[in-house]
Regions:
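ATP/NTP phosphate-donor binding region
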Residues: 1-90
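Active-site nucleophile and cofactor-binding loops and adjacent substrate-binding regions
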Residues: 68, 94-96, 279-285, 346
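Carboxylate- and glycine-rich phosphate/diphosphate-binding segment that chelates Mg2+/Mn2+
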Residues: 155-262, 374
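Structural motif
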Residues: 11, 33-35, 62, 89-92, ...
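Active-site segments that bind and position negatively charged phosphate/pyrophosphate groups
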Residues: 209-328
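Glycine/threonine-rich beta-strand-loop-alpha-helix active-site module
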Residues: 74-184
Length: 390
């Protein structure tokens, strides 16, 4: 049996209304002044309620309304500077994956020198930084407002680097929050489009974690359950946005998808490249790519793909199981009204030209089936064409 290790972080409070325990948790962490970073487009009443719970405990709050939807490095610099100027000892990361990653990164970088601003961030990205994990000397609580990105659960911060022209990763065990407040109420007003693409991001995370060189028995237990929940409940929340049982199941599925002590594969390398080149939301990219990435690993991940089939309620004994699963995923994407690359005005030749950036992203190195630039170009062509496998 393959070895693996787990960590106790983050601690999790799950359930409706759990976001209103933020003040209580910050007080337990000993925080006296908190930077609250949140999506600029969140309902102000929701923001006020969470911040009110913190202020009720006598904790001062500095607000940062994050307007960057793609984890842009400028947001990290802004958030970090605000934290330094106000000498905060706690961070609240509330929003979708981009905002959470910006706040997480800022919480790590307040203690390092960045003489060239956003350009200096390059020195701390995976592939450029060889030092020990960056520490965090302040409390950190994450509250996701979507069910899909899983950023609340991970040690990674995905940042759009203006210097590199790619989405890069800042990684540290300290990026994991002290507490995650997993409140389905925070997702109930999410528009159908964002419900769809964040849900597909969760499905992509779990599928890639299984079809990854780091996959293990723990991954199978955790990500198998995540897929069972997301496959059943994503179509429900898309059509019934205020179905709170389904919302709760999706919130849990998204969290579990990134807690299986595994990683990703070529799918997320392609999603990061396409997202950076065409400024398409990450979950939208994952919706296009996930079926193709899964089918690509079919010769090396037969056991895992059959597990995915079982989680989806498909015939795991089928001799064409990989094709069946990939096609079912494509049909789900289409049923959710997610536009194809062509429908978004992207040209095929431009799309496949992102292949070199796929190879720069290190996540593909964990793919069971090795990737080359020529193969990446071929896979991007399959993604663009959006056809069922025959």
């Amino acid at each position: 049996m393959k070895a693996f290790e787990t960590t106790i972080k983050p601690l999790v409070k799950f359930g409706e209304g759990s976001s209103l325990r933020a003040g209580e948790k910050f007080k337990l962490l000993g925080c006296t002044k908190v930077l609250a970073g949140y999506d600029a487009n969140i309902n102000p009443a929701v923001v006020d309620a969470v911040i009110g719970s913190i202020e009720k405990e006598g904790i001062e709050v500095v607000r940062y309304a994050c307007s960057y939807s793609d984890g842009k490095d400028d947001g990290v610099i802004e958030c970090r500077q605000l934290a330094l100027d106000n000498k905060v000892d706690g961070f609240l990361a509330m929003g979708g994956g981009s905002t959470m990653d910006i706040v997480k990164a800022a919480s790590l970088l307040v203690n390092v020198d960045l003489p060239e601003g956003a350009k200096s961030l390059v020195n701390y990205f995976v592939g450029h930084y060889n030092g020990p994990d960056l520490p965090r000397h302040a409390g950190l609580i994450s509250i996701p407002t979507t069910a899909g990105t899983g950023a609340e659960a991970t040690r990674s911060c995905i940042i759009a680097s203006s210097a590199l022209g790619v989405k890069a990763t800042l990684s540290s065990q300290a990026a994991k929050a002290d507490w995650v407040l997993l409140d389905p109420e925070m997702t109930k007003d999410l528009p159908p489009y964002f419900t769809a693409i964040t849900g597909m991001d969760a499905i992509a995370h779990a599928c890639e974690a299984l079809c990854c060189t780091r996959s293990n028995i723990y991954t199978e237990m955790i990500c198998g359950k995540s897929l069972e929940l997301s496959w059943k409940n994503l179509p429900i929340v898309y059509k019934e946005p205020h179905n709170m049982e389904a919302r709760a199941n999706m919130s849990l599925a998204a969290y579990l998808a990134l807690t299986g002590e595994s990683y990703g594969n070529c799918g997320h390398s392609m999603a990061h490249a396409i997202g950076a080149d065409f400024h398409v939301p990450h979950g939208h990219c994952c919706a296009w790519i996930a079926p193709v990435a899964l089918y690509y690993t079919r010769n090396d991940c037969d056991h895992e793909i059959r597990l995915i089939a079982r989680s989806f309620g498909l015939d795991d004994k089928s001799p064409t199981v990989a094709k069946d699963v990939a096609n079912a995923m494509k049909q789900l994407v289409w049923s959710l009204g997610i536009k194809t690359p062509a429908e978004m005005g992207i040209k095929r030749e431009d799309f496949i030209a992102s292949a070199p950036k796929v190879m720069v992203d290190p996540i593909h190195l964990c793919c069971h089936t090795p990737l080359t630039e020529d193969k990446a170009r071929e896979l991007l062509g399959e993604v663009y064409d959006q056809k069922l496998y025959e």
